[in-house]
């Protein structure tokens, strides 16, 4: 059934987190980025339209500036992310070029998708880039985003951002790459008998209770934000796959119908 479901998928948003791009020692995982570029380029060659939502600016910045941990001051966090964003996009551009794929950068804040005029502008930008066969690479604009009681321009994390991008671009599928195999019925790091949920058809209280845990040293997203992203996909009749990003080539296996990760897809008439 999964292969049949994905045959009609045209537009795909792929989200990769910092933990999938940065090694445990803080160095950049060049091999994984190369594999990701290969997969996306292969999908483009097959007629798919792909948007990449990529975290990693902080991780790249920490590596470039030889910093062992994330600064505590907001201004310094923004500075590190600003440096890292340039380094990350430079590397993406170089590696994608090996596969004859052109990329672009779109940096967003929440204000952009809240106000109708700016939302229309960014939507048109996405459509123009896609029509030219370009892969938009999206990240939150950390250098200018603020999170204050009277005015917040932050999305919270890139899990949520990826679902918002999928919504405004009317993507058919969101593929979320993470450092976990999918959604389990309970925390697999604590319970040895935790079982992977292969298919989720609705976001219930039980599903929400399965989610937990904060982000890693480099990233901010946890399981709950991924569940919320799946709910957002459901709201516009989209679907989502949460899978381990250890080998980005697994994306191709999933789209061929192999059961990996957790597939979030509501049951429709004719599916039962």
UniProtKB/Swiss-Prot annotation:
ATP binds at residues 15, 178-179, 220-226. Its EC number is 2.7.2.11. Substrate binds at residues 55, 142, 158. CDD domains: AAK_G5K_ProB. GO terms for molecular function: ATP binding; glutamate 5-kinase activity. Disulfide bonds: none annotated. Keywords: Amino-acid biosynthesis, ATP-binding, Cytoplasm, Kinase, Nucleotide-binding, Proline biosynthesis, Transferase. It is found in: Cytoplasm. GO terms for cellular component: cytosol. Belongs to the glutamate 5-kinase family. Catalyzes the transfer of a phosphate group to glutamate to form L-glutamate 5-phosphate. PANTHER family: GLUTAMATE 5-KINASE (PTHR43654), ISOPENTENYL PHOSPHATE KINASE (PTHR43654:SF1). This is Glutamate 5-kinase. It comes from Streptococcus equi subsp. zooepidemicus (strain MGCS10565).
